[in-house]
A protein has these predicted regions:
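Bacterial N-terminal signal peptides that target proteins for export
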Residues: 1-10
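Bacterial N-terminal signal peptides
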Residues: 10-20
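Sec-dependent signal peptide cleavage junction
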Residues: 20-31
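Acidic, polar low-complexity linker/tail segments
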Residues: 26, 34-98, 105-112
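C-terminal "exit" segments of structured domains
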Residues: 48, 251-286
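Von Willebrand factor
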Residues: 90-147, 152-198, 227-228, ...
């Protein structure tokens, strides 16, 4: 298989043609109808292979089966080119969890170590082939664990993280993650999910971080991205949470692990379309 990268943007559109099951056809990455919704999670390209991961939910929030989606006649277009939809299946590829932990000293030590315990719950529940890439963010952005599926190494690295002075620089974090993804694209698991974990106290003193809560980080790094905000006053952030459409998760430190596992269960409901990219589009930025 030729190892090329194809740059994609919102020109990649998933259309559902048999509308009896899904209501009105939807364009761009998110579609809603009275009968249900679909949301594109990520596109993975390893030319000529192109995989599209997405969610198709009914009106009650339950996932449609691959058979129903296939029967609906999905169409995939890249710009003005229609791509062949070979099959629709439950997504089974491993996931690379890209986790950024706020290790600032201004977080209460008890909260910080509870946060680390929550991450351990996520590691416990990860599949054997899933990967973890771990960043710390206080003072400077550092990748303390390159992507690995070695759980012993995950636990060891997590246990070595200490609190330091400084605050999170979200612009630097996003830049570092994007750069790392591009340099190790083929070595990482096909599916990727970014998660930022921080404390409400940090947000109230860091306007750049506050702005990040109101933005869609996934648009900047090309994958699903979620921010976990530990707080015992969720009402302060309810407006932001509503606007974030599931990207912002409010929780107490004690329930962080449960929330991370919930997200993992949600990721397990994704569907996948496999297709191929025409050779004429190899290497193009669209």
């Amino acid at each position: 298989m030729r190892q090329h990268k194809l740059w994609l943007c919102a020109l990649l559109v998933l259309l559902l043609a048999a509308l009896g099951a899904f209501g009105a056809a939807a364009e761009t990455t998110v579609g809603m109808s009275g009968a249900g919704s679909f949301k594109m999670e990520q596109v993975y390209v390893n030319v000529p292979e192109l995989d599209v991961y997405f969610y198709a939910l009914d009106g009650d929030g339950n996932s449609y089966s691959p058979i129903k989606v296939q029967a609906a006649g999905p169409e995939l277009t890249l710009g003005d080119r229609r791509l062949e939809v070979r099959s629709v299946a439950a997504a089974s590829d491993p996931i690379c969890y890209i986790l950024a932990l706020d290790n600032s000293k201004s977080i209460e030590p008890s909260e910080f170590y509870t946060m680390l315990g929550g991450v351990r719950k996520l590691i416990n529940a990860m599949g054997d082939d899933d990967q973890l890439m771990l960043y710390t963010t206080a003072g400077s952005t550092e990748c303390v664990l390159p992507a690995t599926s070695d759980k012993n190494l995950m636990y060891k690295t997590l246990g070595s993280i200490k609190q330091v002075e400084g605050s999170m620089d979200t612009a630097r974090l996003i830049s570092a993650v994007y750069s790392e993804l591009q340099s190790d694209y083929q070595a990482l698991a096909p599916r990727k999910a970014a998660m930022i974990v921080t404390d409400a106290g940090q947000v109230l003193t860091n306007m750049a971080l506050f702005a990040t809560l109101a933005s869609d980080v996934s648009d900047q790094i090309g994958m699903a991205a979620y921010i976990y905000l530990m707080t015992d006053r969720p009402g302060v952030f309810e407006t932001l949470e509503s606007a974030a459409d599931g990207r912002l998760v409010l929780c107490e430190a004690l329930t962080l692990g449960d929330e991370l596992k919930k997200k993992q269960e949600y990721l397990a409901t994704a569907l996948e379309i496999k297709t191929e990219v025409p050779e004429s589009l190899y290497g193009e930025r669209l």
